[in-house]
């Protein structure tokens, strides 16, 4: 039983009309740890008990059975609980050590499907640093959902349809060199795309050429289909190489082209329900009652817009997966669009429209510079990951020249550093990326957290102890309690991250645990002869528990935890 449950049960004994759940949601953690481990505010009792909250706190504190606590005291309108450090600490450690992989997990999902769409790069263009945010936020959310008992279904909705591919084909037909494409397909195709956009300013006919090629693709022209399939194949091959580096794996790569085959159904429903309204030659859905701008469905030239594919996709996914939630990890510039998508689905009569969730995020800049594929100043993600690994390798060789499997550790540290930097920031905030800062072993970085755990693992190896089943875990003191009580917050942290779809809660937790452990490591004597053997073993059990929890937290962020660095 965790500390919060002990507090809830002690309170229910003196508040019999309250359920455990009602009490549980009111229990807080004091901002100042000197005020106790938990606090219960009495404001909501004032009306029924007809007393001032301060008096209620004093009265209840006197009635509470203090057997499981060091002390219970009233401070103003709050009842503050100080847990029995040795007994509660031993119980927390036992729970971690007994089943480290599942520590912190709560079966809140009961196996329900949650679709998570993320990454979604465009074919025939390299994955840039701009894709990192969607990819890693989405992957972390999927891992957090799995930890909480949901079944995440990971979807990479490839940008493999649209007028830009017509432009790519037109550019290829004008300037394409097959030898160059075979050698470096994506970067060569990108150079054509950048060139046609640049030169279209003086040659507007290039834009028309692009539209014609896309029209050919829509109507099944064999050459257009051949080029499209080729562009898609070489792109996906390259994307999977980057995903393997990041340890990201999808259940589906069906993209916009797949959805384009199903557009007739949503348009049919919109027509049958009389939702399509003529406006300046186009057809729109009026969403004024939702305080949203009108949604263009069919352009004045008769072609459908992006929304028809997204409507068709949402309908297909609900029918295929019966999802509990369908999450889209897409930049915050699309917020209004996803509100329109939900509103349109509601108008079409789908009661599951509110289960569509848009997880937005802020833009990433590189050393203060914005990125744009259209203008050609995209920063290649694969190049950044490789450079980060090289930097990590250099630092590791300086710290530990004789490290075995140094190359593998360099990959784990270098790639982990890039991922951790992305995820430690609240997802809606814009972030700036500076590689040298990101890979440092000091400060709020991934390598700092990884190194803290590696130090703990080194201590455990030196001790030679691998089994703590006979350890007297009540031998922990105040120094250990600082770590153990913080590890008890892990489950709440995971739940908060899940409810807010915010992996930064996990990253911040991992950083704080690493900081507390480093302080403990620096000030506590463990592997010395004059420390009592029972105390020594209890302290090593704490080190083992910290190692388990840091590894678990990093895994939720898709960051590796090397045992040596």
UniProtKB/Swiss-Prot annotation:
Any single Pfam family the record assigns to this protein: DALR_1
Keyword Flavoprotein: no
Location(s), subcellular: Cytoplasm
Major subcellular site: cytoplasm
SMART domains: Arg_tRNA_synt_N, DALR_1
Keyword Ligase (UniProt): yes
Xref: Gene3D superfamilies: Arginyl tRNA synthetase N-terminal domain, HUPs, Isoleucyl-tRNA Synthetase, Domain 1
GO cellular component: cytoplasm
Motif ('HIGH' region) on chain: 121-131
Enzyme class: ligase
Keyword tags: Aminoacyl-tRNA synthetase, ATP-binding, Cytoplasm, Ligase, Nucleotide-binding, Protein biosynthesis
GO molecular function: arginine-tRNA ligase activity; ATP binding
E.C. number(s) listed in UniProt: 6.1.1.19
UniProt xrefs under CDD domains: Anticodon_Ia_Arg, ArgRS_core
Catalysed conversion reaction: tRNA(Arg) + L-arginine + ATP = L-arginyl-tRNA(Arg) + AMP + diphosphate
Gene Ontology process terms (BP): arginyl-tRNA aminoacylation
Family note: Belongs to the class-I aminoacyl-tRNA synthetase family.
Oligomer and partners: Monomer.
PANTHER family tied to this protein: ARGININE--TRNA LIGASE, CYTOPLASMIC, ARGINYL-TRNA SYNTHETASE
Name under which the protein is recorded: Arginine--tRNA ligase
Gene (UniProt): argS
């Amino acid at each position: 039983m965790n500390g919060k449950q002990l507090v809830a049960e002690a309170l229910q004994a003196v508040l019999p009309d309250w359920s455990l759940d009602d009490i549980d949601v009111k229990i807080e953690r004091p901002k100042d740890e000197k005020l106790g481990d938990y606090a219960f505010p009495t404001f909501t009792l004032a009306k029924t008990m007809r007393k001032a909250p301060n008096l209620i706190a004093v009265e209840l504190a006197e009635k509470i059975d203090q057997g499981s606590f060091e002390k219970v005291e009233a401070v103003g309108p709050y009842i503050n609980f100080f847990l029995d450090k040795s007994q509660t600490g031993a119980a927390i450690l036992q729970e971690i050590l007994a089943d480290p992989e599942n520590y912190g997990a709560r079966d809140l999902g009961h196996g329900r499907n949650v679709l998570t769409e993320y990454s979604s790069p465009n074919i025939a263009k390299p994955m840039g640093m701009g894709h990192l945010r969607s990819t890693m936020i989405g992957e972390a959310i999927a891992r957090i959902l799995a930890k909480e008992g949901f079944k995440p279904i990971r979807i990479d909705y490839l940008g493999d349809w649209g007028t830009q591919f017509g432009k790519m084909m037109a550019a290829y037909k004008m300037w394409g060199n097959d030898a160059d494409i075979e050698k470096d397909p994506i970067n060569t195709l990108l150079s054509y795309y950048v060139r046609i956009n640049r030169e279209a300013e003086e040659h507007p006919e290039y834009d028309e050429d692009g539209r014609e090629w896309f029209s050919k693709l829509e109507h099944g022209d064999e050459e257009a289909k051949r080029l499209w399939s080729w562009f898609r194949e070489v792109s996906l091959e390259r994307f999977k190489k980057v995903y393997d580096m990041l340890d990201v794996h999808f259940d589906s790569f069906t993209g916009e082209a797949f959805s384009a085959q199903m557009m007739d159904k949503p348009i049919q429903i919109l027509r049958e329900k009389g939702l399509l309204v003529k406006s300046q030659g186009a057809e729109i859905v009026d969403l004024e009652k939702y305080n949203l701008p009108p949604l263009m469905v069919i352009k004045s030239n008769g072609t459908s817009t992006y929304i028809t594919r997204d409507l068709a996709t949402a309908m297909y996914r609900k029918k295929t997966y019966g999802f509990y939630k369908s999450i889209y990890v897409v930049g915050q510039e699309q917020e209004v669009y996803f509100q329109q998508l939900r509103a349109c689905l509601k108008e079409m009569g789908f009661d599951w429209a509110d289960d569509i969730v848009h997880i937005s995020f802020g833009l990433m800049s590189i050393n203060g510079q914005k990125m744009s594929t259209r203008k050609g100043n995209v920063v290649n993600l694969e190049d950044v990951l490789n450079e980060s690994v090289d930097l990590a390798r250099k630092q590791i060789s300086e710290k530990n020249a004789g490290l075995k499997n140094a190359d593998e550790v360099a990959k784990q540290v270098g790639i982990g550093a890039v991922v951790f930097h992305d995820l430690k920031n609240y997802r809606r905030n814009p972030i700036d990326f500076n590689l040298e800062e990101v890979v440092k072993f000091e400060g709020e970085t991934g390598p700092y957290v990884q190194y803290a755990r590696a130090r703990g693992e080194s201590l455990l190896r030196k001790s030679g102890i691998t089994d703590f089943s006979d350890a007297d875990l009540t031998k922990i003191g105040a120094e250990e309690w600082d770590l153990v009580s913080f590890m008890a917050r892990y489950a709440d942290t995971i739940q908060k991250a899940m409810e807010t779809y915010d992996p930064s809660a996990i990253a911040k937790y991992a950083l704080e645990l690493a900081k507390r452990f480093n302080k403990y490591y620096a000030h506590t004597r463990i592997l010395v002869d004059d420390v009592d053997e029972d105390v020594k073993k209890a302290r090593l059990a704490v080190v083992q528990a910290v190692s388990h929890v840091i590894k678990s937290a990093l895994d939720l962020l898709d960051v590796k935890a090397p045992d040596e660095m």
